[in-house]
A protein has these predicted regions:
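Macrodomain-like recognition of ADP-ribose-binding/processing modules
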Residues: 2-295
Length: 295
């Protein structure tokens, strides 16, 4: 029963998207068009009249067509890519950034590495991490970061500064990207995103990291000067550029369902094709992708 309820919730969310409704209608029309054509051809070969038999066939096939269209119209939620000219394995998926084990996860922060109000939003990735691993001692993460920085008190760090902390079964790279901003907690510029990404790839090489799991760098900060799609393109371009200069680790880009249209992966796939990537594995959206921890 729980699986059925999860599936119903998933389709309720999907039907709220105009892109999914349009895709579903196109798939249904294609299915019934092909069905009618094949049925008419079969009846013509058999020498039978089409009206009654054809109508009966359509009645029988309608439930099959609806089920087929509902499944076939599901957007892709997990795509793995391979590049023929660079060692740069890539995976882009819709899911929960924290839902993994033995991974190196990147979390972007402001240049003071703040972990609490007023400089950190209540639904930020940093706050989510604290709720998962430091809920009884919320100041412990802040103390661990300052210790790694060899600081007794806060001080602004350069863009791209990285602090590595282990928590639970994963390691976390806290990446300094944004500046403090009085009205919106943190703000970020495109050049800061590019610089921090360059530092991230260098860090991965120097520390022999095999794979990084990242959100869309820069998208979680207020007053970002561009939208989510350009930031994804920036992330992909930076990663492949670095890999062409020198081999770099594998990359997993995790998109939260609440952050983007579910057709976003189709756009990402198209841009990856332009960059020379080939999709080697694709998985459709399932109820597990939408039953995530709230942000």
């Amino acid at each position: 029963m729980s699986s059925i309820r999860a599936t119903i919730r998933m389709y309720q969310k999907l039907f709220a998207l105009r892109t999914y409704r349009r895709r579903l209608i196109v798939t249904l029309l294609a299915f019934f068009g092909a069905t009618v054509t094949v049925a008419q051809l079969a009846l013509w070969i058999a020498g039978q009249t089409a009206s009654t038999t054809l109508a009966f066939s359509l009645v029988i096939l309608t439930p099959i067509g609806v089920v087929f269209a509902l499944r076939a119209s599901l957007p892709k939620a997990d795509i793995s890519f391979r590049h023929d000219s660079a060692t740069a394995p890539l995976r882009v998926l819709i899911g929960d950034l924290f839902a993994t084990d033995d991974a190196v996860i990147v979390i972007t922060m402001n240049r003071h590495f703040d972990t609490a109000h007023p400089w950190v939003s209540g639904d930020s990735l940093v706050t989510q991490l604290i709720h998962r691993h430091y809920v009884d001692h919320p100041d412990e993460l802040r103390s661990a970061i300052l210790k790694e920085l060899s600081l007794q008190q806060e001080a602004e760090q350069p863009v791209g500064e990285i602090v590595r902390i282990s928590a639970g079964k994963n390691s976390y790279l806290f990446l300094a990207v944004a500046d403090r901003h009085e009205q919106t907690r943190s703000s970020v510029a495109v050049d800061a995103v590019w610089s921090s990404l360059s530092r991230l790839w260098q860090y991965a090489r120097l520390n022999n990291i095999s794979r990084l799991r990242v959100p869309v760098i820069g998208s979680g900060f207020a007053r970002a000067q561009v939208g989510r799609v350009p930031l994804i393109i920036l992330l992909l371009t930076s990663y492949l550029t670095a890999a062409m200069e020198m081999p770099v680790c594998g990359l997993e880009i995790v998109l939260h369902p609440d952050d983007a249209d579910l057709d976003l992966l189709e756009l990402v796939k198209a841009y990856c094709d332009i960059l020379g990537y080939r999709a080697i594995d694709q998985k459709p959206l399932g109820e597990g992708y939408l039953a995530l921890h709230p942000r």
